[in-house]
Amino acid sequence: MSSANNISGAPETGDFTFTQHFNVSATPSEFLASIWPYRHMMWIGPMLLFLAPRFYNTLKNTAFSRAYHMPYSILALHVFISFVDLANYHTQVFLANGAIHPASQIDALICIVQCWTSLYITAQHHLLPKIAMEVTRATFHCMSVQRLFATAMAIRTGDPRWHEASIMLLNNFIWARLLIAYCKMGRFSWKQRYGVGIVGSHLLGMWNGTYPHGIAIYCGLMVVLLNIDGWAKGRDSSVARALRYLGLATPADWYIKVGIDPPTKSAEKKEA
């Protein structure tokens, strides 16, 4: 890799030694700057320790898939491919001494499978907490769409920063649980903790991966997805049914399952 393409700032040749690359006698700010290119190596250890047991428990618990109306095989594939995607990326960065590598065709295929399973599970996950169901579901969709877009840009441009932005959105799994745990210290209900965890984790995932124009893309996607959901409510056309089937609109029976009255057009006009 040439120096022009080495955006991470990591050394390109030579064996990795701590004293060679980290100036331990420098000021705190200089030391932090010297270890920044190796943040991936520092992340992979805690990531594996945190995720591996949870992935195993999810795969072992078949009752979870039955409770949320989704095939166990799809859930197992989603968990497995997500773990493979994360481990593959961070391992390659580790072996390259912190250098970010561009996306390959295999990386693109793994991303497509992971996003497809995520979209499918979101479409089947009809029992999300009642708070801002549309917002949390749309955020899940945004994650998949933004990952696919970033991976496509990484393949098209060869810029490894797009690949990093795509992978770092998978860290939403960790950010969400940290935010939910943090909210337990306040006077938040479970529904509020869940909403903060899902939306907040996506924002942190974009920040973690320095997603180019991520906030603007996220806001634009949210406006489109929420308008699609609002249009499909109360309609029984083939298009509306297709949107509900694909998980892009609130299922007709969701309100009955969670025990609330479905919104009507007259009620929405009164609120407006």
Swiss-Prot record:
It is a multi-pass membrane protein. Glycans are attached at residues 6, 23, 208. Keywords: Antibiotic biosynthesis, Glycoprotein, Membrane, Transmembrane, Transmembrane helix. It comes from the Eukaryota. One of its GO terms (cellular component) is membrane. It is found in: Membrane. This is Sordarin/hypoxysordarin biosynthesis cluster protein P. It comes from Sordaria araneosa (Pleurage araneosa). The gene is sdnP.
